């Protein structure tokens, strides 16, 4: 366990956040839909809606491609969060949850803005779902019900996505207040943002 106080402590934690974000970004660079499309001779970013995510893969390449893209994009965020948890849990037990969040956010950034594809990736829905599952699994059931329910009723993935993010934020506030997030109180405001 590493304990630094004052400026050195803040600098170390900033460094840990940057490392976690970087790890997440690297995982997010794995563009499942783009790579699957390329294996089929198609650049998914020049077809359909033009993004490399699950919905466009499903529409352009079919159900198999959609499921593979969803699974890959979901898993890359989960793996990034789990790796950061393993790397930092002993050194920063009170801060590991915030570092997990940075890793998940980094994965979404890498997915949405991959540098090697001129920052043109997916929309981050499946990747965000993976982050939610890994960082705050308590929030996942309500998010899943809202997502599936809203799509079944309206056929709008974008509405489902908005409901998931809104629901996640509300649930994190509630779970944080109730102490279910297992995060040091000093990090709660940052976790909420």
Where are these regions (language model features)?
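Cytosolic, membrane-interface loops and tails of multi-pass inner-membrane proteins
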Residues: 34-64, 121
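Interfacial segments of multi-pass membrane proteins
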Residues: 58-63, 84-88, 124-154, 167-176
């Amino acid at each position: 366990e590493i304990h630094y106080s004052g400026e050195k402590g803040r600098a170390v934690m900033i460094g840990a956040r940057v490392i976690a974000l970087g790890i997440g970004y690297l995982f997010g660079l794995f563009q499942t839909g783009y790579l699957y499309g390329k294996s089929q001779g198609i650049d998914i970013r020049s077809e359909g809606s033009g993004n490399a995510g699950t919905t466009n893969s499903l529409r352009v390449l079919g159900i198999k491609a959609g499921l593979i893209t969803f699974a890959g994009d979901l898993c890359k965020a989960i793996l990034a969060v789990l790796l950061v948890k393993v790397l930092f849990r002993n050194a920063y037990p009170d801060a590991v949850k915030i570092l997990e969040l940075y890793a998940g956010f980094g994965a979404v950034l890498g997915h949405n803005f991959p540098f090697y594809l001129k920052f043109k990736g997916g929309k981050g829905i499946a990747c965000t779902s993976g982050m939610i599952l890994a960082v705050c699994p308590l929030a996942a059931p309500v998010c899943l019900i809202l997502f599936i329910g809203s799509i079944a009723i309206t056929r709008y993935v974008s509405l489902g996505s908005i409901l998931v993010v809104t629901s996640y934020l509300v649930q994190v506030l509630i779970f944080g207040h109730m102490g279910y997030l297992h995060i040091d109180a000093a990090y709660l405001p940052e976790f909420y943002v």
